[in-house]
Amino acid sequence: MVYNLGQLAQQLNAQLVGDAELNIYRLATFEKAAQGDITFVSDKNLLTRLDECNASAIVLPNSFKQGYQGNALFMETPYVGYALLARIFDTTPNPQPAIAASAQIHKNAIIGQNVTIAHNVVIEEGVVIGDNCQIMDNVVIGQYSTLGENTRIYPNATLYHQTELGKRCIIHANAVIGSDGFGNAPYQGTWIKIPQIGKVIIGDDVEIGASTTIDRGGLSDTLIANGVKIDNQCQIAHNVSIGAHTAIAGGSNVAGSTKIGSNCIVGGCVAINGHITIVDNVVVTGDSMVMRSITEPGIYSSGVPAQKNKAWRKTTAHTLKIDDLFKRVKALEKQLKDNT
């Protein structure tokens, strides 16, 4: 695919400086860009290295209009420009609407217009598939589930019964949505399984990463609001509620019945306790453990950064002595007070 720089400027709503007829063939990184490529700069440190870049054009911040003489598109946020360019130059396969002969579709399922259903897909009774959906190989969609229009489900994903997906959702490979939550009642040294009779309801424009699991609710539903982005290998337990446009990075776990607000960012490998609430506009940095509710917006951390093993062992040894040191300091303070 080929676009000239003027066309790209129009699609990005960017200010063009340079040759509007210049042909652009690819989007590339700053370091590897060559002639015919366009790149972007969102890292301020790279602004001092523009003479090292071999790209035919660069997306730059508006604040740098006086600092570059080559072909450029100027935007308030070049990273947004990168996102839009990635959409333009996207090479993800886009299969033509068709239903494979090997697909197993219940006679009572409702299939919309221009739908792709690939090999060995199973669509059970009462399922409703919206227009322009793409369902890849080996996907299973359980009874009475619904898919909004323009939703894409990648191979080997499983949607249990009564799962609801909104419009324009993306479900990546091996994701499992609507499996049983971890509900068991202790009884005389054993466990009684509690059937999970809620469901999972997912809004519009949600993306669920590969091998992520979202459990169905016990009594109430597990709710994922519009625009939520959940990375790979995350666990979202039963009855959890995640607010609009919150993003959760890979390997994070959210325990049951926790409510996460809107526009939050949860870093990788974060563990969030159950039955707590996190308000809107909270950032939790990677490897943190959230044990109590967060009631004020802000950035929260609890992870321990890596250090050399010898230093870490020394720090840990000191940590084990904190209680004893605290008692000694209190005793010294009392002694000092008594002597004055």
From Swiss-Prot:
Protein family according to the UniProt entry: Belongs to the transferase hexapeptide repeat family. LpxD subfamily.
Organism in which the protein naturally occurs: Psychromonas ingrahamii (strain DSM 17664 / CCUG 51855 / 37)
| Record-given protein name | UDP-3-O-acylglucosamine N-acyltransferase
CDD domains from the UniProt entry: LbH_LpxD (cd03352)
Which pathway is this protein assigned to? Bacterial outer membrane biogenesis; LPS lipid A biosynthesis
User: Which EC class is this protein assigned?
Assistant: transferase
A single GO molecular function, which one? N-acyltransferase activity
Q: Where are the transmembrane segments?
A: none
Q: What domain of life is recorded for the organism?
A: Bacteria
CC terms in the record's Gene Ontology section:
membrane
Query: Known catalysed reaction(s)?
Result: a UDP-3-O-[(3R)-3-hydroxyacyl]-alpha-D-glucosamine + a (3R)-hydroxyacyl-[ACP] = a UDP-2-N,3-O-bis[(3R)-3-hydroxyacyl]-alpha-D-glucosamine + holo-[ACP] + H(+)
Entry-linked Pfam families:
Hexapep, LpxD
